[in-house]
Amino acid sequence: MFGFGQLIEILKKDPKKIVFTEGEDPRILEAASRLLASNFLHPILVGDPEKISASAEKSGFNIRGAEIIDPMNFDRMDEMVELFCELRKSKGVTPEQAKGILSSANYFGTMLVKMGIADSLLGGATYSTADTVRPALQLIKTKPGNTIVSSCFILVRPSATGENEVLAMSDCAINIHPTEDELVEIAGESAECAKIFGIDPKVAFLSYSTLGSGKGEDVDKMRNAAHKAREKYPNLPIEGEIQFDAAVAPRVARTKCPQSEVAGHANTFIFPDINAGNIGYKIAQRLGNFEAYGPILLGLNAPNNDLSRGCNAGEVYSMAIITAALA
């Protein structure tokens, strides 16, 4: 089952470069110093080199070896501006406008990924989710065949057997009212994400109804989405619509859906909307004593993840490992 040691071993074999858009933030600097000491990731800090160095020195963090790139003094800015204008030509962006936009650390950092200078990006310690995600949607864009970006939380809790209990929950942060087809896409992306963390995905499309016990448009949406997902991913164990207790409790599953291979053993949960998803993962985190990692953005051409503005340095460090491992 999942442990960060597994991801670190993968990264040691193929170290990645990760952009931190808030290079002066002490939490970012502490995480970067830990990553540099471990030597399995190469941090790129965006910002004024003098301010970053002063902040690191004041906080007592050794960031020697980190690459610092200043948007105001970038030797490939003309190339970046030209590419940005090409990517945004449908909006009629001029070079002067591009230079102004690229003074934003979020847009600048995202373009570093787009240009191949970095493999992934982590931001949001001081910016809103919208400010962090918008450049990725405009510049990195979705993978071929994908129509949306979604999100997944990985929840980890030590079990009595000594192995970690690991679950995946989606979409808890991005899509407010996903359609049936969007739920299908979310399920497929979440299952692939789950595999990276050692989960053999068993997918449950959650509802207040189990296999027809309730009725209504919301029930129909989850039932139809589960049916479409089974058709699209024939090798992926999927159940739905299903209530949470039937999805996770074998005793309840034997009563409500005894023929299901997923019921009672689900580990990848697809919520009907963002309300249910956000509430659900936070209940698991606060009352179930799970560590929650995310939101992990799914469906992009390159990893771009969003931190909570209330994050600490340990959470930055963990999300950096996760983000790099997805590259």
Residue ranges and their predicted role:
Residues M1-A263, T268-A327:
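Anion-binding alpha/beta catalytic cores of soluble intermediary-metabolism enzymes, centered on
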